[in-house]
Amino acid sequence: EIAQCLVGSEMCIRDSIRTYLEKEGVETRVDMHLRKNKSKGIAIDGTKIKKAADLLGLCNVVFFSPEDLSIIKNGPAERRRFVDMELCQLDSFYLYNLNHYNKIANQRNKLLKDLYFRPDLKDTLMIWDSQLVSFGSKIIERRKVFVEQLNEIIYNIHKRLSGDKEELKIVYEPDVEIENFEAALRAAQDKDIKLKQTTVGPHRDDFSFYANGIDIRRFGSQGQQRTAALSLKLSEIELIKKITKDTPILLLDDVLSELDSNRQNFLLNGIGDIQTIITCTGLEEFVNNRVEMNKIFKVSNGVVTSEN
C-alpha cells in the first residue's frame, strides 16, 4: 500500500514529498527533497540515508513509459540500463559491483587521457585492468543468470500477447567472455590509448530479442518490437514477484496512449492484482470501465485536485 502526501506549502516550496509505505503491516515514512542547488536528499523514518543501496527492498517498483516501447529498436545503452536498473533493485551485490566497476572504468579512462602527456604511466594500466576484470566478471555472471530467469517467464507471456503466433527469446551478448576478459584488455591497450577510453568490458554489452528465431531489433516490425517491449515489462513484474515474494508497485507514465486497444486490454487485464499509479490524458478513453480506480487526481495549470 502506498500513499503520497504533499505536506503543506512549505514542502512545495522546498520541492519535497513525503511518502508512506506499508508492507506486511509495518509503515515506513520516506522523505525526499530537492534543494535549490539541485542536490537530492532522502530520509527513512527521519534518518538520512547515505547511499542508494539503503533503499533496496524498501519498495519494489516497475516503471513503464512510452520510451520503454522503443527499448528493442534503440541503442544498446538503453537495454543495458533496463537490465542494470532491474538488477540493482533486486540485488545489492550487483549494485555494489556495478558502482565499483563504473568508478574503476572512469579512473582507467582518466589514465588513458593522461598517458598522452605521461607515457611513463603506461605500466600502471594493469592495476586498473585487474580490478576491472574482477568486478566486471561478476556483472557478466549476474546478467547471464538474469536473462535466463527472464526467459523462463517471458516465453508464456509473449505467446499469449501475440495470440500464440510468436515465441520470444532474449539473448545476452556480452562484449567479452569472462575467461578472455584480461587478455582482451591487453590486446586493446594501444587502441584504448589512442581513443582515450576503455573499449572492452560489460559496459559495451548488448541484448537481442528473437521472435520465432528472427532478430526483431533488426528485422522486426514496429508492432513486433512494441509487443516484445510490453512482454518485457510484464515479465519484469513477474520476476520481481518470484524473487522477492512481493508484488511491486506499477507506474504507468502516459504509456496507454502509445498502445493499440488490444495491447491496452492485455496490459490492464494483467495488472488487476497490482497496485498501479497511472498518469494519462483522456482518463475516460484509456481507463474507465477497465480497472477499479481508488483515487483520481487531476492536474490543471499546475494545480492538483482530487476528484474522488
What are these regions (language model features)?
Residues 1-8, 12-13:
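Single conserved hydrophobic/aromatic residue that forms the stacking wall/gate
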Residues 7-10, 245, 278-283:
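Short beta-strand-centered segment that lines the nucleotide-binding/catalytic pocket of NTP-utilizing
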Residues 14-36, 41-43, 265:
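Conserved nucleotide-sensing/catalytic segment adjacent to the nucleotide-binding pocket
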Residues 27, 41, 61, 249-250:
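Hydrophobic "anchor" residues on beta-strands that sit immediately upstream
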Residues 34-188:
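Electropositive, glycine-dotted interaction segments
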Residues 64, 250-251, 278:
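Hydrophobic positions in the central parallel beta-sheet of the AAA+
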Residues 116-249, 258-262, 266-269, 275, ...:
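Conserved NTPase motor "head" modules and their coupling/switch loops across ABC/AAA+ ATPases, GTPases
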Residues 253-255:
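Walker B catalytic acidic pair
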